[in-house]
Amino acid sequence: MLILVSPAKTLDFDNPPGCESYSMPTLLDQSKQLIEVCRTLTPTDIATLMKVSDKIAGLNVARFSSWQKDFTPENAKQAVFAFRGDVYTGLDADTLSEASLQKAQKQLRILSGLYGLLKPLDLMQAYRLEMGTRLANDRGTNLYQFWGDIITDEINKTTEEQGDEFIINLASNEYFKAVKPKQLNAQVITPIFKDCKNGQYKVISFFAKKARGMMVRYILDNHVDSLEALIKFDTAGYYYSEKDSTVNEPVFLREAQ
């Protein structure tokens, strides 16, 4: 199975990575085209486009300006160690064993507005470019049009090479919209995580994001390779609810925290 997750806005380029091994992103030529578009934007443009403060806009102007395609461990960092945020808190990549890291390199892919699709150990330079950004480019008015079939084709190439029957979609709607499910050659499974609040089970964003990361960790550490094994996920008190689930959307519930 191949797992898809979203990136994170929060980045860590200060602390050393959890391992020395690294790989290179497959779609860097595409990234370079986007960087060239982003370099035409002023801080005011970025603040408006990304709905961020002037300080963050200025930071991103500097990031786009200093971005260079020749990645090395000195000027870039492996994606799974660079991203911070709720999903990555749940995954806790810094404590993955070498075996689980290598499994992640094969099984996990990170969707990205700038890089398209990243393997966990792919080097990346700091950026902020969310997939939903309406960045006009040569291919259209937004990043979905820019990426077109490219990300989907890359996923299909990977699943064909590895013989993956299932794609476990643990990405947000914003990012999974960059994938064209009808063109995929594997069955898409989208786990749903609900927490009990005021007597009702609801998707609570903070908890759901963290749960996605915990499920990635569960898959890697427990060598999960079937849906039967996947629904045994029980980290942090979650449990599979058969009556609330469908074939493609297994639902996991948790009592009030």
Swiss-Prot record:
Alphabetized InterPro entries for the sequence: YaaA (IPR005583)
Alphabetical GO biological process terms: response to hydroperoxide
Transmembrane segments: none
GO cellular component: cytosol
NCBIfam families, per the entry: PRK02101.1-1 (NF002541), PRK02101.1-3 (NF002542)
UniProt family annotation: Belongs to the UPF0246 family.
Name the record gives this protein: UPF0246 protein Shal_1126
The species this protein was found in: Shewanella halifaxensis (strain HAW-EB4)
Phylogenetic classification of the source organism: Bacteria, Pseudomonadati, Pseudomonadota, Gammaproteobacteria, Alteromonadales
